[in-house]
């Protein structure tokens, strides 16, 4: 997928999750 410039190491994807991004390997991907 495409990296969404947000990490999800400590907290889940927040803002980018609204854009359809999900956590994968500690990084939010679309």
UniProtKB/Swiss-Prot annotation:
Signal peptide: none annotated. Keywords: Disulfide bond, Knottin, Plant defense. Expressed in roots. SUPFAM superfamilies: Cyclotides (SSF57038). This is a cyclic peptide. Disulfide bonds join 4-21, 8-23, 13-28. Belongs to the cyclotide family. Bracelet subfamily. The presence of a 'disulfide through disulfide knot' structurally defines this protein as a knottin. This is Root cyclotide 1. It comes from Viola hederacea (Australian violet).
